[in-house]
UniProtKB/Swiss-Prot annotation:
Induction info: Induced by both low pH and low Mg(2+) via the PhoQ/PhoP two-component regulatory system. Responds to general intracellular signals that are present both in initial and in progressive stages of infection.
Protein name, UniProt field: Outer membrane protein PagN
Signal peptide boundaries: 1-22
Source organism phylogeny: Bacteria, Pseudomonadati, Pseudomonadota, Gammaproteobacteria, Enterobacterales
SUPFAM superfamilies xref list: OMPA-like
Written domain comment of the UniProt record: All four putative extracellular loops are crucial for invasion of mammalian cells.
Organism: Salmonella typhimurium (strain LT2 / SGSC1412 / ATCC 700720)
Gene from which the chain derives: pagN
Amino acid sequence: MKNFFAVCIIPLVVAWSATASAKEGIYITGKAGTSVVNVYGINSTFSQDEIVNGHATLPDRTKGVFGGGVAIGYDFYDPFQLPVRLELDTTFRGETDAKGGQDIIAFGDPVHINVKNQVRMTTYMVNGYYDFHNSTAFTPYISAGVGLAHVKLSNNTIPVGFGINETLSASKNNFAWGAGIGAKYAVTDNIMIDASYKYINAGKVSISKNHYAGDEHTAYDADTKAASNDFMLGITYAF
């Protein structure tokens, strides 16, 4: 992840160096709002001696959680008259949970299992923007970005009637991509209010566990995908 950002920040440094004397282009943004996180494609599979004896695709879950982040970027409009921006962005989001149940056959007996998945995603993106400058203080824009998504999954299973409560955790760094729209309002020459919407796809995270008892082998696998619809309000300061 560090190498990723070391490479991505080079264009910003070069652009800044080219216009350092004018002190124009660099900006920072802080933002907060609601992230509507979608947890989908949720699979839960139990197997015994390599034979699947219980598989379930759990219901998708969409939940609004608090989201926020910071960004540093370079606006090419003032120094170069190009209506584009390039920025590095970090956004965190609250936890989303998805619940369901499945029936399996364990050692010859039917068992119902309550399953709960908790997902949290943080993204580190390189975003590009195209600004539609006009004669007003409002500037609409479109955006697209790629980067890394750190997705954490906590999977809880409770076999009903057995007094067992087990939680497994895993995390994964995935390729992430996104696109969005928004508008900024210039309060002063240096301060802007930014309202935006972005869709971010964070990929898939999975968990697995194996248990051996003599000649018997039981296994459990779970996986889910995550995406977010981010509705943010931010304040930007341009240097």
